[in-house]
Amino acid sequence: MRNLIRSVEFDEFYSSLPLNVQNKVQYAMNIISEIRVVNTKLVKKLVDTDFYELRISVGNEYRVILFTIDHENFIEAQEILLLNGFIKKSTKDYKKEIEKAKQILNTLSDENKD
């Protein structure tokens, strides 16, 4: 079973979602925490990054940027950090959201050094 760690930014995104979308996100989180090998329709590696995306479709395309803490490979990882989420409108959204995820990760890393 995986341990999912939620960032403040993820929690802010999650709480802003309509209840039906929150339910779907929670369902997806349950799947990735309990099932080791997850279909790429749900979790996919983001090209040229250290991140993965959790893919949720409820009318709109919702994405959550994930980071595997203890292993580079999602399947092997036991600690997953949920960094931030967004509504995907175009592929251009990814660059901005990946930069935001990097900033969150750097901030969390700096906090853990103290």
Predicted features along the sequence, with ranges:
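Basic, Lys/Arg-enriched alpha-helical interface segments
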Residues: 1-62, 72-79, 87-114
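Conserved catalytic cores of phosphodiester-cleaving nucleases, focusing on short active-site segments
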Residues: 83
